[in-house]
Amino acid sequence: MPSTDTIAAVATAVAPGQGGIAVIRLSGPAAEATGRSVVHCPGRQEWGSHRVVYGHVIDSEGRRLDEVLLLLMRGPRSFTGEDVVEIHCHGGVIAVQRVLEKVLRQPGVRRAQPGEFSQRAVLNGRLDLTRAEAVSELVAARSRRAAELAMAGLDGGIQAEITVLRERLLDQLTELEARVDFEEDLPPLDGEALLQQLQAVRLELQQLVRDGERGDALRQGLRVALVGRPNVGKSSLLNRLSRRERAIVTDLPGTTRDLLESEIVLEGVPITLLDTAGIRSTDDAVEQLGIARSEQALATADVVLLVLDGHAGWTAEDAALLARIPAQIPRILVANKADLPAGAFPQPVDVQLSALEGMGEADLVQALLERCGAAGTDGMLVALNQRQRDLAARAAEALARSQEVAAQQLPWDFWTIDLREAIRALGEITGEELTEAVLDRVFSRFCIGK
């Protein structure tokens, strides 16, 4: 599906004073002509596909804007399947902006929309939709495990899984439709065996959905709030988990007067630890502001660690804090100071540890991952994203309805209705059955330049 216009955008992250090199990407019929117009190459350098040339970008008054390398990739041997030019210029906001503005002033060139390069790759058959989504997920990966799963998708893991399941359903649909049209000429169809095969596909789809939900923790990370009355060791626990002195640790109540954050990775899961100010009654205006932010962190956390003083035991303040945790948010009761004699608790705690000595830390990590559904991701080969999970769940529901049709002993043509729906949903995962409007919605979530 050749495009009539040429798009351009910065394909690398740009920040003030950061990054030695930036890449400006062009794709479309005017890409090569634009590259030749914008980049002036000294000497007799040979232009060719997949060759690099050296030159300068010059403004309308003949002044050099930047020293660059240009890489031409003629279609269809390119990411988008179209003629693609990459201009490698110096990094930094100003240098990149000047070169991009020069590119966008050329005839037939416009600024790319978010995800438009990947969308063209899909429309031109260079990528299936799951691989295109994996590119975006690889760029956004916040941990090595998330990057590994994204690479599995980029290598075709998701596409292969879904294609196999879809082909199994297509085989069954072929059998059913043959019986509808030529039942008298064919041997009887074993409906029970057919149902077993549909049930097997449904169970595999449901497992993919469950794995994908765990994969979300790897992609998006978790927000974990450390809550407790003052001086129970929340800041010590934050420092223990993050392996650095992120919070000031003293024996004075109210030392943490604001919300502190620390980014860590536990068992491949990116986690934002929120060390909240001790929630208590106070006349200190600054501390009151920190407490208000702590309460907001409670409402937005994926899981709450209620840190208790294991030496002092359970108090009325602990009970009040437990009651303030929203009911729908998982919570873990952590008795800190396990290196000291234990106090009394009216209910069992989930984890006993010493933030100072490190004992019990592994138990806390395991409890945290299990409570938020992020445990057991090591054996996962692929992880469906939200869009893919919704479609896989829709296919599984359609297959469940086919069992209801069988129970009612309806004719074969009734079976085909839900089977076609399941096949269509799986085709939407890989992009085999998608409208351009749906593609626009999918790629609008991508970064510009991807």
UniProtKB/Swiss-Prot annotation:
Gene3D superfamilies noted in UniProt: P-loop containing nucleotide triphosphate hydrolases (3.40.50.300), Probable tRNA modification gtpase trme, domain 1 (3.30.1360.120), tRNA modification GTPase MnmE domain 2 (1.20.120.430)
Domain of life: Bacteria
Keywords noted in UniProt: Cytoplasm, GTP-binding, Hydrolase, Magnesium, Metal-binding, Nucleotide-binding, Potassium, tRNA processing
UniProt EC number: 3.6.-.-
Binding site for K(+): 231, 250, 252, 255
Residues annotated for Mg(2+) binding in this entry: 235, 256
Family matches, as Pfam families: MMR_HSR1, MnmE_helical, TrmE_N
InterPro entries named among the record's database cross-references: G_TrmE, GTP-bd, GTP-bd_TrmE_N, GTPase_MnmE, MnmE_dom2, MnmE_helical, P-loop_NTPase, Small_GTP-bd
BP GO terms, sorted: tRNA methylation; tRNA wobble uridine modification
PANTHER family in UniProt: TRNA MODIFICATION GTPASE GTPBP3, TRNA MODIFICATION GTPASE GTPBP3, MITOCHONDRIAL
Cited function: Exhibits a very high intrinsic GTPase hydrolysis rate. Involved in the addition of a carboxymethylaminomethyl (cmnm) group at the wobble position (U34) of certain tRNAs, forming tRNA-cmnm(5)s(2)U34.
Protein name stated in the entry: tRNA modification GTPase MnmE
Organism expressing this protein natively: Synechococcus sp. (strain CC9605)
Phylogenetic placement of the source organism: Bacteria, Bacillati, Cyanobacteriota, Cyanophyceae, Synechococcales
